[in-house]
Every structure is written in C-alpha cells, then in structure tokens.
Amino acid sequence: MGDPDLLEVLAEEGEKVNKHIDYSFQMSEQSLSSRETSFLINEETMPAKRFNLFLRRRLMFQKNQQSKDSIFFRDGIRQIDFVLSYVDDVKKDAELKAERRKEFETNLRKTGLELEIEDKRDSEDGRTYFVKIHAPWEVLVTYAEVLGIKMPIKESDIPRPKHTPISYVLGPVRLPLSVKYPHPEYFTAQFSRHRQELFLIEDQATFFPSSSRNRIVYYILSRCPFGIEDGKKRFGIERLLNSNTYSSAYPLHDGQYWKPSEPPNPTNERYTLHQNWARFSYFYKEQPLDLIKNYYGEKIGIYFVFLGFYTEMLFFAAVVGLACFIYGLLSMEHNTSSTEICDPEIGGQMIMCPLCDQVCDYWRLNSTCLASKFSHLFDNESTVFFAIFMGIWVTLFLEFWKQRQARLEYEWDLVDFEEEQQQLQLRPEFEAMCKHRKLNAVTKEMEPYMPLYTRIPWYFLSGATVTLWMSLVVTSMVAVIVYRLSVFATFASFMESDASLKQVKSFLTPQITTSLTGSCLNFIVILILNFFYEKISAWITKMEIPRTYQEYESSLTLKMFLFQFVNFYSSCFYVAFFKGKFVGYPGKYTYLFNEWRSEECDPGGCLIELTTQLTIIMTGKQIFGNIKEAIYPLALNWWRRRKARTNSEKLYSRWEQDHDLESFGPLGLFYEYLETVTQFGFVTLFVASFPLAPLLALINNIVEIRVDAWKLTTQYRRTVASKAHSIGVWQDILYGMAVLSVATNAFIVAFTSDIIPRLVYYYAYSTNATQPMTGYVNNSLSVFLIADFPNHTAPSEKRDFITCRYRDYRYPPDDENKYFHNMQFWHVLAAKMTFIIVMEHVVFLVKFLLAWMIPDVPKDVVERIKREKLMTIKILHDFELNKLKENLGINSNEFAKHVMIEENKAQLAKSTL
C-alpha cells in the first residue's frame, strides 16, 4: 500500500466511483469467483473499501475482455480441465439438487480442485450455470501416481522404423512427420510425485497433456461424495447426471476446429486433426494415430487403428474379388450354359413347367437368357477360388491384427495395462438396488452385494425378451417370404399378359422382380426392428442390474450382436440354404402353410438371388448408416445454435460452444464397433456369392473413417480420455464369425451355386470330348408329363405339348421309378458333401498353420520392449543411487570407496565362515 503509483491510481479510482460505491460493490461481488474474492482485504475503512472495489473492477474488466475462445479461468493462467453445467431449476426437488451441488463442489475443493462458476446471466439461454474446474499441479501429480500414468523420463534411443522402398511409393498417402509423430519417443515410467526430478518436467503447465488432465479430473469427479441419502454415502458425477442435478459434464476442446489457437491458448490439436484427418479431401491419407490417441485417449484411438487396419486389409480382398468379377464378365458371352439357354434351337425349344399354380403359364427357357448371363458373373469357376481365398484372408487379417495390436501396446505404453478403474467401478444403479454388503477379497473393504437369487428373475425376463425379439425377426422374415410367394404369381401373370412389358421381360423376370421387391421390403423391416430393439436391449440390460460399467457393456454387446446377427443375416441364410431346396416337383409341390407354393430357383441357380439380397441389405445399411451418422448430430447442433446462426464465436464462450455440441455418450464406440462387425459378417459369411462385397466395404470404410473423424472433431463434445489395449469382446466375435464363414461359404459353393453339378457333369456324364459342357442344360432339367398335373395346379389354358421341364435330377415319366431322384442326383449330393469336407479341412489346416507361423508379437517389438524395460530399470537405479549419494553427503569417489570397503568386509566375513 506504500507504492506511490498505486496510491495515485487508487485516488483516481476513488473519485470516479465514490457516488456509486455501494451499488458497484454489490454488482461486482455477484460476478466474482470465491478465489477472486480471496484477494480482497478487510473493509473497515473507506480507502480499503475503495481498494477492494478497484480490484473487483479490474477483475471484471479482465472477465469482459477475455476472449470468448479462451480455455482458461478469468485470470488467464489456470487452464480449464473440465466443465459441469446445470440449469436453474424451479421444480419441487430443486432444493435437494442445490444441496447436492453445494456439497459436491465443496468436496471437490477439498480434494484440491479449483472451481470458477459462470452465472446464468452470462449464458446464451439465461438459464444455464457453468462450473469450470482446474486441477493444480499438486492434484495432478498425486492422482497421476494413483492412476499409474506413465510419463517420459528420457528420450528414446530406439530409432523409428526405417524407410523402405515401398515407403517412397506410398509417399502421397503419408502425412508430414510433425503430424504423424507430434512428440518425440521417450522411455517412460509410472509417475511418482516423490521422484519428480526423474521426469522430464520442463513446464508444469504443459507436462501433463490435456487428455491426462481430463482423465484425472474425471477420476476425482467419479469418486467425490455429495452426501448421505437413505443411510448410504452417495458419490460420483454419473449419479448426479442421472438425477439431473447436473445436466452435463465434459472436458473442453482445444479451440475452434477451423482455425489455430491464438496465445495464450496452447497448441490447438483439434485444428490439426481437422486439417489432416477429418476432411474428406484427405480420404487417401493415412491417419494421424498418435495425435488421435493424444487428444481422445487410447480407447478411441484403438478403434480408428482397427478400422484403418481392417480397411487396408480389405484392399487385397477387394482386388482379388474384382479380378474374379472381371473374369466372370469376360467369360459371360462364352459360357456354354448361357449360350445353350439363349440359343433359340436349344433354350427356345425347352418348355418349362409353370412357376405357380393355375394362373402361371408355361414358358420357354430362353426367356431367362439375360438372367443366366448375369448369374454367370458371380457363379463361375472363380467362385471356388474366391471362397477358399477369403477363408485364408480372414485368418491373415486376424493374425496380423494381433501383431498390430501388440505393436500398438508397445508404442502407446500399454504393455502393463490394467483395466480402467472407471470401467470396474460399481454402477450407481447397482448400488441403489443392493441391500446386502460383503467383504471384497481384494480390497478388504465392505461393498454392495446382490445375491444371485434376486437377479435370476431379471435374467429370465432378459432371456425371454431377447428370444421374443429374435422370434419376431424370424416371423418378419416368414412374412416377407409369404409376400414373395403371394406376389410372384401376380408378377408372373401380369408380365405375361401385359404386352408393354415385352421389352423388359428378358432381364426383368418374375423371379428377379420378386427378389428385388422382397429384398427392399426386407431391408425396411430390418431397419424398423433394429430401431426398436436398440431401445429394448438397453432397457432389459439395465433391468439385469449389471455390477460394473464393463459388465453392462459386455451384456449389451451380446444382446445387440445376437439380434443384429439374426436381423441382418436371416434373410441371406434363407436364400442361401433353404430357398429352392425343398420345392418338390410338378404334381407334388411342397406348400407353406398348405397355401403358398415354395419358391423355386432360377434355372441358372439361386446364387444370383443371394447376390441381390446381399447387395441391397449391405449397401443400403452402409448408405443409411453414413447418412444418419452425418446428419443426426449436425441437425441437433444446428437446433441448439439456432439463436446464434451468425458469428457464433462472438456470442458463445468456449465452454458454451462445447455444451451445445452433441454428447458422444458412453456407448458411442459400442455402436461404431457393432456397425463394423456387422459389415465384417457380410464380407465373410456370404462372400462366395458376391465377390464385390469387399470392394463395397472398402469404399464404405474409406468414407466411414472420415465421417467418424469429422463428427468427433466438429459435431461432438470432447470425450473423456480412456485407456484400452484391445478391441475387447469384439475380437472374440470376429474369431467366431471367421470360423463360421468357412462353413457358410463351403455350403454356398456346394448347395447354392451351380459349380458342383457342372463339375460332376464335366467329369462323369459328358459325352462330348471336345466340348465337355455341351448338353449340360438339357441334362440338368428333368421331364414331367403334363397329364400328371393335379387339376388344382395345372394352368387353366390347354397346350398342344405333352411334357414340360423342371430343375431337378429325377427319372422321366416313362421310367418305372418315375419322378424319383435318379443316380446323378446322389452323385451330385455326394460330390457336394465331399467338397464341403475337403474345403473346410483345407482351409482350417491353412488357418492353423498360418496362426502357428505368425507370432502374436513381432520379434522387433519383443526386442524393443526388452530394451525399454532395461533402460527404465537402469535410469531408475541411477536416480536412486544418486539420491542416496546426496543423502549420505559424499561425492562419487568417496561413495565408490565406501562401497568397495563394504564389499571387502562382506567377502572377508564369508571366507571366515
């Protein structure tokens, strides 16, 4: 107070505000934080009162002049690590919520966190309070040790992977090294506040990255108590969010995604991510994985690593699949079967039996000429090769992913990973329902416990609900089948009688028309059922009262995957393994519910229909999913910002801008994995019928990566950084689907495609040595005597021919075993079963050999891990040794001499014994 300059300023300020001092005092105090008011002095005298007012006015001036994009407290020094928000509530439980918040925030301050509250009058809606949280150095170092966060102790001497010749070829897809490797490589060790000198601490404000800071704060928030209710201690931000005591809790983004930060804000990694990752013009570039991990945490980072690796592996499958498709395209015009079907002298002379009862007429085989050519695109010799190739590809994918995962564990310091504490934390819903407690064998503390007998009813309810919804899926599939059966006759009679459709009959047959409309209808039903089941599955999982967040996610994963499996794949299984297999024959057809005649396959086979079904469902799901992922958060955020459509940067503070973004939610990654694994099923389970499936998946994933990056960077709040060392239970699901895919593709080749019957004819029944496939079409069609039609199935119009043909291997009407399966049928069946056994054994043998030959952890990674452990131990040893020297107060020579004396004494004592 003795500084003359300061006294002069005080005098000037006092003259200006003397008349309004009381009013200014009241207004300024309402807008200052508790920490700011702590700078004030005792106001017993007028000069002191004026001095306090001066400080308040200066603090208010700083507040008003603070950049709206600032991520600091009003002092411009303390960084905001987390934000809580709540709405001014006038409901009857408002007082209870206010008491909870007061107790919670008081306890947060007791842990060492610093809080600053933004009044609702400063918010855009005039209703929302914001609580800004800062973790000071002492809090960070304490909880970094508790969480076992690894921090750098020395720059690594292990060189990064060297450039290979292929690296120069891939130059255009590479990112700048400053983006790909934003930080140098370090040897790391678990942080210890008692060994701070060991760590490379250049600046305390930037030593802990923002992801580690928000992880530490969230750890405190999730354990901070807020009172005792019903005789139980209540704690955790999640419980307060569930009760709407707080409306949201989130860490701040670094800044705007469309421009770099201005001082004093730190480097804007969000902007860097948007520029180099979240733009669609960078679709061909690699991902900045280290930067993603640094900003969002390992759990989100590993999802993008997996999606990127899966996409890279799809490239090889897509190339082979495209080659198989091109082979089918080039050989389409030279295919003997299609040539015979299209030949007026062969296919044009073959009268086929009606495809439905009474209303359908006889038809000539060459009317399916174009359809048979299309069928050859996917049903040719390359189908067998591609089915075997994909069985091997999926093994290579999973084995190389294990290697990639092991390398990732080393690069991201996850070698000694332990499950995230918050994932193992008890759910508030579980605690609320528990009436018993028992001793935890590990922690030796009493914890809530729910006996099994109290949960059994909920398990039964859960199982019954899942079974009911799966039954509903099957019922909907049967309904679509009934639709196909009922409209097939309508399409057939309509297309036969309408002369205007003559031009399209060659490629739009009743079978294809029914298949297209049925597949589209099935896709719509799938989306509707999926929408409702997502809500139902979340509800029944909550009813099971899972103990931890990890148990909740695992239970939900199982339910959702089982439903998705049945919902998306059931129609494909029907077309692949049931359609056309139990038709019967003319005069003795099989009927669904004794009313609708079973569907038949096209003379060219059922594979083209499976291809159609797979294409519509897979492509439709991917397009719909990407549109929904992009538009949904965009629309919600626009609605929240509708009051500030222009120049929102000036209207909103940084915390309010982030508050108005959509929350990614605790299950955000769950749905991303579910979508990817469902696509993986389409690519592997039925790929023999559609070699272009990997190409479609590749294109979708290239878009998916950028859509996910864009929405995370621009449309969602920043997520709390979480650790994960693998993709979790999804890896087991992928392994299960990989094994199942070998069987499904073997059965598709054997029973759905026409490859095996052709091979049997080629080697056993062909009589033409120069062109062995000549006569195959005639051989594959059996003969039926029209007079044998029952009255209720025969066409209403009489014809002058006496026989018709149908697809099967049966004796002709003039044989003593008429209409029974002939010997060729059994030969073909034996060949099909043999093929399945041989293919499965060959593929599984190759799979096991590859799994044995490819190590789970690459050799160079093993060496790097050993090197880092050795160097870490050495650095820790040297640190402790130097510390011991300092404590003993002796120099290095004296210390060495002291050690030698002690060693000599020990040897002497040993020799005397």
Swiss-Prot record:
Keyword annotations for this protein, in alphabetical order, are: Cell membrane, Disease variant, Endoplasmic reticulum, Glycoprotein, Limb-girdle muscular dystrophy, Membrane, Osteogenesis imperfecta, Transmembrane, Transmembrane helix
Mutagenesis / variant outcome for changing A830V = In LGMDR12; uncertain significance
**Phenotype when changing M833K:** In LGMDR12; uncertain significance
Report where it is expressed, by tissue.
Answer: Highly expressed in brain, heart, kidney, lung, and skeletal muscle. Weakly expressed in bone marrow, fetal liver, placenta, spleen, thymus, osteoblasts and periodontal ligament cells.
Query: Where does this one sit in the cell?
Result: Endoplasmic reticulum membrane; Cell membrane
Q: Which InterPro entries match?
A: Anoct_dimer, Anoctamin, Anoctamin_TM
Q: What is the effect of changing T206A?
A: In LGMDR12; uncertain significance
Q: What does this protein do?
A: Plays a role in plasma membrane repair in a process involving annexins. Does not exhibit calcium-activated chloride channel (CaCC) activity.
Impact noted for substituting L781P = In LGMDR12; uncertain significance
Q: Which residues lie on this side of the membrane: Extracellular?
A: 321-380, 484-511, 579-679, 754-834
Q: Which ranges make up the Cytoplasmic topological domains here? A: 1-299, 402-462, 533-557, 701-732, 856-913
Swapping W655C leads to an effect described as:
In MMD3; uncertain significance
Family, according to the entry, reads as follows: Belongs to the anoctamin family.
Which coarse location class describes where this protein primarily resides?
endoplasmic reticulum
Protein name per Swiss-Prot or TrEMBL: Anoctamin-5
Q: Which consequence is recorded for altering N52S?
A: In LGMDR12; uncertain significance
